[in-house]
Design a protein with these regions (language model features):
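HIT superfamily nucleotide-processing domains
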Residues: 1-108
Length: 108
């Protein structure tokens, strides 16, 4: 698998996803192989390696606004939510992405 699943598969349209919310620069969708009963991924539509390499403050604000909107909906519907991003060796796909999830982990 490529180092950037999100550009190579999701944004290219090769892997269809269930869109949750989309803006001009950000896409939120249901994870293709969820770890939690509710598992939504939020990504920028351009390649950004990680949170540490994001230099565009406007894009960062747009990403956080989408994460906040998704998280608020998850909390409203499920009573709680987690928001996380991985860095370094914890980051499987080298494309900045946030996970918004709820419930007990269903796979490891």
């Amino acid at each position: 698998m490529s180092e950037d699943f999100y550009c190579d598969q999701v944004l290219s349209g090769k892997t269809p996803v269930g869109k949750v919310l989309e803006t001009e620069n950000v896409l939120a969708f249901h994870h293709t192989r969820p770890f939690w009963p509710v598992h939504i991924v939020v990504i920028p539509k351009i390649h950004v390696g990680s949170l540490l390499t994001l230099d565009d403050n406007e894009l960062l604000i747009e990403l956080i606004e989408v994460v906040k909107k998704i998280a608020a909906t998850v909390v409203e519907e499920h009573g709680a939510a987690r928001v996380l991003t991985n860095l370094g060796e914890y980051q499987d796909s080298k494309h900045l992405h946030f996970h918004v999830n709820a419930g007990d982990q269903i796979r490891g």
